[in-house]
């Protein structure tokens, strides 16, 4: 890892300016949400684990949940000078990592995460301009704050820009 890379852990988020790159690994059923203000060149990345917090009575880490992490990321970006109407989103992850014959056993958390992220971004009026979701492989997301490009590295499938 070099000085221009910022690692985002699971149930974590951060905001950066050029020339920084925001990187998150281990996107299985989790979703990486990259938000970018191309005018101010401010980028933010969140790594969420679960679709929504409403089923939990005690939320120890709000960054685990799509419904709480996205507003937190927006607030952090706006404090850096980002303008919500300029934001565009790119998302990755949401895989079905376990091959159970009965999909309801795990309630397809990857698909539920993906739907929840899209719903929350829609509520904030943030368009998703690119995505790499679904499937059954883990991903790494590398987000450049220079130009908003997101590189996806998928296990056994190489590298793809979204």
Curated annotation (Swiss-Prot):
State the source organism's domain of life.
Bacteria
CDD domains, alphabetically? CheD
The family database entries (InterPro entries) matched by this protein are listed as: CheD-like_sf, Chemorcpt_Glu_NH3ase_CheD, Cytotoxic_necrot_fac-like_cat
Q: List the disulfide bonds.
A: none
Which reaction is this enzyme known to catalyze? L-glutaminyl-[protein] + H2O = L-glutamyl-[protein] + NH4(+)
Which Gene Ontology MF annotations are present? protein-glutamine glutaminase activity
Q: Give the record's keywords alphabetically.
A: Chemotaxis, Hydrolase
List its EC numbers.
3.5.1.44
Quick one: a GO biological-process term for this protein?
A: chemotaxis
The UniProt entry, under Pfam families, shows: CheD
The record's family statement is: Belongs to the CheD family.
Query: What does the UniProt function comment say about this protein?
Result: Probably deamidates glutamine residues to glutamate on methyl-accepting chemotaxis receptors (MCPs), playing an important role in chemotaxis.
The name under which this protein is listed is Probable chemoreceptor glutamine deamidase CheD
Q: Which organism is it from?
A: Clostridium novyi (strain NT)
Gene name as annotated: cheD
């Amino acid at each position: 890892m070099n000085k221009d890379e910022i690692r985002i852990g699971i149930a974590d988020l951060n905001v950066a300016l050029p020339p920084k790159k925001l990187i998150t690994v281990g996107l299985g059923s989790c979703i990486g949400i990259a938000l970018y203000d191309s005018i101010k060149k401010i980028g933010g990345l969140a790594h969420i684990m679960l679709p929504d917090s409403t089923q939990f009575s005690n939320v120890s880490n709000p960054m685990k949940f799509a419904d709480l992490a996205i507003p937190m990321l927006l607030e952090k970006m706006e404090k850096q000078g980002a303008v919500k109407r300029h934001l565009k989103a790119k998302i990755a992850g949401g895989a079905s990592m376990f091959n159970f014959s009965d999909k309801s056993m795990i309630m397809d958390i990857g698909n539920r995460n993906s739907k929840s992220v899209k719903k929350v971004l829609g509520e904030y009026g943030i368009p998703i301009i690119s995505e790499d979701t679904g499937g059954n492989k883990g991903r790494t997301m590398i987000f450049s704050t220079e130009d908003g490009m997101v590189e996806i590295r998928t296990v056994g499938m190489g590298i793809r820009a979204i």
